[in-house]
Amino acid sequence: MDPAGSPSTYNLAFVISDGSDCTPKWNGTYAIGNSAVASRISALKESGASVRVSFGGASGKELAETCSSASKLAEAYGAALDAAGATLADFDIEGDTLTDSASVELRSQAIALLQKDRSDLSVSFTLPVMPAGLDDDSIALLESANDNSVQVATVNIMTMNYGSSYDGDMGDYALTSAEAAHDQLADVFGLSSKGAWQGLALTSMIGVNDVDNETFTLADAAQVRSFAEEKGVAWVSMWSTFRDQQCDDGSKSNDAATDCSGVKQTSGAFAEAFAG
């Protein structure tokens, strides 16, 4: 746990299918009621933070790909939310899952059912982005949610891993991506400029990214924070809490690690930079 910066919410990533049926599991492996996971969630809540259950991610099978009906899918999502004691649900949809129109539609139907039963449920979508904005598949997902009367509180864009041709400043890319996505959200949801900013969140991959030549620095984090405050966005976040520390050998790295940033820093420095 990283208490630096006093985060208001932790995204718990990820709940996915166990691979073949409609059973939600942490990382596709651990039962949603796993005692060790429950203990960690309790510790996060005791710090004063809320928790948001994030479904999907880059690996494994998202539940909409393995559940046979909207009602069963809604039940699976609800079970995971109940296990975590959460009223915040995020759907991190990327890769092949984003292009699967059948699962996109089923997910929208299930979320709508879930919101009918849970009036306090706040829903966000986490989607990949480029400096030019959201791609056609992401727009189609948001339109599906709209068509099924899903109340979308926030669209969280992943300002990271743009590709080998993007070798410029990562802070600048984050801002450019946000500006483009803002205009798209205003169009899809019929929002005012202010409303579109309030419905947008930014998540950056701190330190060394998965793509060569992409490194998000502490200065970039401060730049994103300042921009977010100016525009009034919903939140800024990072991938991930476990990475917000210097690697053991203290040196910079050319490869992204799961447990450290790959840049020189003090523990929790990125959280503090985002918090201001």
Predicted regions, residues:
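Chitinase-like catalytic core of GlcNAc-active glycosidases
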Residues: 1-191, 195-201, 205-221, 247-273
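Short, low-complexity, polybasic intrinsically disordered segments
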Residues: 214-235
